[in-house]
Protein backbone atom coordinates (compact mmCIF):
# COMPACT_ATOMS: atom_id res chain seq x y z
CA UNK A 1 0.00 0.00 0.00
CA UNK A 2 1.18 3.50 -0.82
CA UNK A 3 0.11 6.28 1.53
CA UNK A 4 0.60 9.95 0.69
CA UNK A 5 0.61 12.43 3.56
CA UNK A 6 0.18 16.09 2.61
CA UNK A 7 0.95 18.39 5.52
CA UNK A 8 2.33 21.74 6.63
CA UNK A 9 6.10 21.99 6.28
CA UNK A 10 6.63 22.34 10.04
CA UNK A 11 4.94 18.94 10.61
CA UNK A 12 6.94 16.97 8.03
CA UNK A 13 9.70 15.71 10.35
CA UNK A 14 7.37 14.65 13.18
CA UNK A 15 5.17 12.77 10.71
CA UNK A 16 8.24 11.16 9.18
CA UNK A 17 9.45 9.86 12.56
CA UNK A 18 6.00 8.62 13.61
CA UNK A 19 5.48 6.91 10.22
CA UNK A 20 8.78 5.03 10.51
CA UNK A 21 8.03 4.00 14.10
CA UNK A 22 4.74 2.41 12.94
CA UNK A 23 6.83 -0.05 10.93
CA UNK A 24 8.91 -1.13 13.95
CA UNK A 25 8.37 -4.84 13.32
CA UNK A 26 9.40 -4.61 9.66
CA UNK A 27 12.63 -3.97 7.78
CA UNK A 28 12.84 -1.04 5.46
CA UNK A 29 14.35 2.02 3.89
CA UNK A 30 14.13 5.67 4.90
CA UNK A 31 15.03 8.20 2.23
CA UNK A 32 16.22 11.47 3.76
CA UNK A 33 15.70 14.44 1.47
CA UNK A 34 14.89 17.25 3.94
CA UNK A 35 17.14 16.47 6.93
CA UNK A 36 20.45 14.58 7.13
CA UNK A 37 20.88 11.31 9.00
CA UNK A 38 22.45 13.12 11.97
CA UNK A 39 19.15 14.98 12.55
CA UNK A 40 17.09 11.78 12.86
CA UNK A 41 19.63 9.24 14.16
CA UNK A 42 18.66 9.58 17.82
CA UNK A 43 14.93 9.36 17.07
CA UNK A 44 15.11 6.30 14.81
CA UNK A 45 17.32 3.46 15.88
CA UNK A 46 17.11 -0.08 14.66
CA UNK A 47 19.15 -2.65 12.82
CA UNK A 48 16.35 -3.22 10.34
CA UNK A 49 16.39 0.32 8.94
CA UNK A 50 18.64 1.40 6.10
CA UNK A 51 18.91 5.14 5.49
CA UNK A 52 19.53 6.73 2.12
CA UNK A 53 20.85 10.19 2.96
CA UNK A 54 20.80 12.72 0.13
CA UNK A 55 22.25 15.53 2.23
CA UNK A 56 25.36 14.29 4.03
CA UNK A 57 28.01 11.62 3.75
CA UNK A 58 27.59 9.85 7.07
CA UNK A 59 30.06 7.10 7.91
CA UNK A 60 27.45 4.95 9.64
CA UNK A 61 27.07 1.31 8.64
CA UNK A 62 23.34 1.62 7.91
CA UNK A 63 23.58 4.80 5.79
CA UNK A 64 24.10 5.18 2.04
CA UNK A 65 24.79 8.59 0.50
CA UNK A 66 23.21 9.47 -2.84
CA UNK A 67 23.20 13.02 -4.26
CA UNK A 68 19.63 14.40 -4.54
CA UNK A 69 20.29 15.51 -8.11
CA UNK A 70 20.94 11.92 -9.28
CA UNK A 71 17.49 10.35 -9.37
CA UNK A 72 18.76 7.32 -11.29
CA UNK A 73 21.25 6.53 -8.51
CA UNK A 74 18.52 7.14 -5.93
CA UNK A 75 16.21 4.69 -7.70
CA UNK A 76 18.97 2.06 -7.86
CA UNK A 77 19.83 2.59 -4.17
CA UNK A 78 16.18 2.20 -3.11
CA UNK A 79 15.84 -0.92 -5.27
CA UNK A 80 18.99 -2.57 -3.92
CA UNK A 81 18.24 -1.59 -0.33
CA UNK A 82 14.72 -3.02 -0.43
CA UNK A 83 15.90 -6.19 -2.15
CA UNK A 84 18.46 -6.74 0.64
CA UNK A 85 15.66 -7.33 3.17
CA UNK A 86 13.52 -10.46 3.51
CA UNK A 87 9.81 -10.51 4.31
CA UNK A 88 7.51 -7.49 4.58
CA UNK A 89 9.29 -4.20 3.88
CA UNK A 90 8.61 -0.49 4.10
CA UNK A 91 9.80 2.66 2.36
CA UNK A 92 9.39 6.16 3.81
CA UNK A 93 10.43 9.44 2.15
CA UNK A 94 10.81 12.33 4.61
CA UNK A 95 9.89 15.05 2.11
CA UNK A 96 9.46 13.88 -1.46
CA UNK A 97 8.70 17.36 -2.80
CA UNK A 98 12.14 18.59 -1.69
CA UNK A 99 13.59 16.65 -4.63
CA UNK A 100 12.34 19.52 -6.82
CA UNK A 101 14.97 21.81 -5.29
CA UNK A 102 17.69 19.97 -7.26
CA UNK A 103 15.62 18.56 -10.13
CA UNK A 104 12.97 19.93 -12.50
CA UNK A 105 9.43 19.14 -11.24
CA UNK A 106 8.57 17.23 -14.45
CA UNK A 107 11.58 14.96 -13.92
CA UNK A 108 10.62 14.36 -10.28
CA UNK A 109 7.05 13.54 -11.40
CA UNK A 110 8.38 10.91 -13.82
CA UNK A 111 10.67 9.57 -11.08
CA UNK A 112 7.66 9.33 -8.74
CA UNK A 113 5.63 7.38 -11.30
CA UNK A 114 8.49 4.98 -11.95
CA UNK A 115 9.38 4.47 -8.29
CA UNK A 116 5.81 4.03 -7.04
CA UNK A 117 5.08 1.55 -9.83
CA UNK A 118 8.08 -0.48 -8.66
CA UNK A 119 7.04 -0.18 -5.00
CA UNK A 120 3.63 -1.60 -5.88
CA UNK A 121 5.25 -4.48 -7.81
CA UNK A 122 7.52 -5.30 -4.85
CA UNK A 123 4.55 -5.26 -2.41
CA UNK A 124 6.25 -2.70 -0.18
CA UNK A 125 4.40 -0.55 2.37
CA UNK A 126 5.27 3.04 1.42
CA UNK A 127 4.69 6.42 3.01
CA UNK A 128 5.41 9.52 0.97
CA UNK A 129 5.32 12.84 2.84
CA UNK A 130 5.02 16.19 1.07
CA UNK A 131 4.65 19.73 2.35
CA UNK A 132 1.52 21.56 1.18
CA UNK A 133 3.46 24.74 0.62
CA UNK A 134 5.58 24.95 -2.49
CA UNK A 135 4.86 21.50 -3.89
CA UNK A 136 4.55 21.52 -7.66
CA UNK A 137 0.91 20.97 -8.71
CA UNK A 138 1.79 18.33 -11.33
CA UNK A 139 3.94 16.40 -8.86
CA UNK A 140 1.20 16.50 -6.23
CA UNK A 141 -1.36 15.27 -8.79
CA UNK A 142 0.92 12.38 -9.81
CA UNK A 143 1.50 11.41 -6.18
CA UNK A 144 -2.22 11.57 -5.36
CA UNK A 145 -3.10 9.43 -8.39
CA UNK A 146 -0.44 6.85 -7.52
CA UNK A 147 -1.32 6.59 -3.83
CA UNK A 148 -3.79 4.08 -2.41
CA UNK A 149 -4.58 6.45 0.44
CA UNK A 150 -4.18 10.23 0.76
CA UNK A 151 -4.16 11.95 4.16
CA UNK A 152 -4.20 15.72 4.60
CA UNK A 153 -2.90 16.72 8.03
What are the roles of these predicted feature ranges?
Residues 1-42:
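Glycine-rich P-loop/Walker A and Walker A-like loops and their local beta1-loop-alpha1 context
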Residues 4, 90-93, 127:
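Structural motif
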Residues 9-13, 36-38, 58, 97-105, ...:
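Short acidic, S/G/P-rich loop/turn micro-motifs used as interaction or catalytic elements
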Residues 24, 44-47, 145-147:
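Short, structured coil segments at secondary-structure junctions
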Residues 124-125, 131-153:
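Phosphate-binding/switch region of NTP-binding enzymes
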Amino acid sequence: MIKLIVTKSEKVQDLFVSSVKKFSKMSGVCVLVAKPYSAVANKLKGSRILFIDTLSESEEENVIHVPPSNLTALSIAVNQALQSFEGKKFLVFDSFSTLTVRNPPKVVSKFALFLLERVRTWDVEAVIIVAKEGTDAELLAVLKQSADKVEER
